[in-house]
Amino acid sequence: MKFVAGLVLGLILVPAALYFYLIGGSAPVATTDPDIPFESYLARKAQHVRIDRDMPKTAPIQPTEANYLAGAELYKQHCAVCHGLPDSKKTAIATGMYPRPPQLFMGKGVTDDEPGESYWKIFNGFRLTGMPGFSKSLNETQMWQMALLLANADKLPASVKAALVAPPTATASAASPAASAPAAPATAAQPPR
């Protein structure tokens, strides 16, 4: 009987203590605060399981130079401020974020990901990280162009590498869905499989 009473008391006290910890202002909410124990591990584990389960298995567009170039312009417009460009330092915005956004052209990270994994990340974003989902602002083709660019970042043609470090062009604005009607808007809650 004492065991059952202790178990019930524990089931009440642990959530109550957690609740008061959170509302008492002790929880680390600033970007400069240290991690809660296991926070990073659990977040990464949950991300990988969800992405592996839901990511599209094949890309509906081909990894062509034209798609890489379009993806490069979109990347510069929407992603570079946080994720950087080839051979560039972290921006002030990236340095001040938590978790720190990965610098995607630094030789590790997305180049070993399947295009569908990068697409899932672009489509959905990540809660509480500053990484937005682009499903409401870019169309399917645009998101796949960026996903293919990132998945192949270590083997891009010279013209695409040059486009990544060049100032944004007028084409970047024209590629924006606000400037042109999207061919296939992304309206699903999750990307197609």
Regions found by a protein language model. Give the residues of each.
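Detector for the c-type heme attachment site
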Residues: 82-88, 123-124, 135-138, 151
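Gly/Gly-Pro-rich "capping" loops immediately C-terminal to redox-active cysteine motifs
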Residues: 68, 72, 84-117, 134
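Sequence/structural segment immediately N-terminal to covalent heme-attachment motifs in c-type
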Residues: 65-88, 176-180
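Short, flexible loop/turn segments with low-complexity composition
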Residues: 159-169
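Sec-exported extracytoplasmic/periplasmic mature domains
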Residues: 76, 80, 123-127, 148-155
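Periplasmic c-type cytochrome electron-transfer domains
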Residues: 2-69, 93, 113-117, 134-149, ...
